[in-house]
């Protein structure tokens, strides 16, 4: 009897060991994904949260009209699991979108447009040059926000001294950690791809004007920098767009948007496709 009990105990010990190993294997090797595709917007877009003056009409998302002193934002309705506290893993992600800035003329344009990653309870911040995402040019870790800005108006307090319109990567401050001069093509569609490589912590931005008629000018731009997302943003975030106007103005519109993220070492997945 004792021998049988010993064998049973050994069997259960081996079984539990195999079970725990299997659970750990799948836990470590599973991947949580979030995906969505919006090829065109609709007036009753269900998967967006609108803030300020943001709204959708047939085929486009309008963040601001070409009027003074406005702030408009739109967030994807579901939170994104951008890093995992238990494993320390960070998600790889790529997002692409097409946007248009329409101003009455190409000289008096303000203030700009961003794609941003922020806490789940994010609210519109200061307008004007702060682009509805930040409140200060000083680094503030409590902001917990990363943004890619497409800045159309020079602000001497924090913008590059060359006074150019620019693309910038912002981390907890409206003062960009890196910038690239950018020539706005008023009324032209711009295609943007933003990708984050979790292995290197490199955030890369590319912008192209596919239908540009300005053959003598640069029509594509690339910018990158190291951003440690895990040290900046919360584990769960919202993603979205923001745009502002001031004394000068423009309409800021998004025509399409896709997003895909993969976070390894977790056990759930979420996918969505929206036409």
From Swiss-Prot:
Pfam families the record matches: Lectin_legB
Residues the record marks as carrying a glycan: 217
Residue sites binding Ca(2+) per the record: 151, 153, 155, 159
Segment forming the signal sequence: 1-30
Annotated positions binding Mn(2+): 149, 151, 159, 166
Oligomeric and partner information: Tetramer of two alpha and two beta chains.
Other remarks on this protein: Binds one manganese (or another transition metal) ion and one calcium ion. The metal ions are essential for the saccharide-binding and cell-agglutinating activities.
PANTHER family with a match to the protein in the record: CONCANAVALIN A-LIKE LECTIN FAMILY PROTEIN, LECTIN
Protein name per its UniProtKB record: Lectin
Organism expressing this protein natively: Pisum sativum
């Amino acid at each position: 009897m004792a021998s049988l009990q010993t064998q049973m105990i050994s069997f259960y010990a081996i079984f539990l060991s195999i079970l725990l190993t299997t659970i750990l294997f799948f836990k470590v090797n599973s991947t949580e994904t979030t995906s969505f595709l919006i090829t065109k917007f609709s007036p009753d877009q269900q998967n967006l949260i609108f803030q300020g003056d943001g709204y959708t009409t047939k085929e486009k998302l309008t963040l601001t009209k070409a009027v003074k002193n406005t702030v408009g934002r739109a967030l994807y309705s579901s939170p994104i699991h951008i890093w995992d506290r238990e494993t320390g893993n960070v998600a790889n992600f790529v997002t692409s979108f097409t946007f248009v800035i329409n101003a009455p003329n190409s000289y008096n344009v303000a203030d700009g447009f961003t794609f941003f990653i922020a806490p789940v309870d994010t609210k519109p911040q200061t307008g004007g040059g702060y682009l509805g995402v930040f409140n200060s040019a000083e680094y503030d870790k409590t902001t917990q926000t990363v943004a890619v800005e497409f800045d159309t108006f020079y602000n001497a307090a924090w913008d590059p001294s060359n006074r150019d319109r620019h693309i910038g990567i912002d981390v907890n401050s409206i003062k960009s950690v890196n910038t690239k001069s950018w020539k706005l093509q008023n009324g032209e569609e711009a295609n943007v791809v933003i990708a984050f490589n979790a292995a290197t912590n490199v955030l890369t931005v590319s912008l192209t004007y596919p239908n540009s008629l300005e053959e003598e000018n640069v029509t594509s731009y690339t910018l990158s920098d190291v951003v440690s997302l895990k040290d900046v943003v919360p584990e769960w975030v919202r993603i979205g767009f923001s745009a502002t106007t001031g004394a000068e103005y423009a309409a800021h519109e998004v025509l399409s948007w896709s997003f895909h993220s993969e976070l390894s070492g977790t056990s759930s997945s979420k996918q969505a496709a929206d036409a």
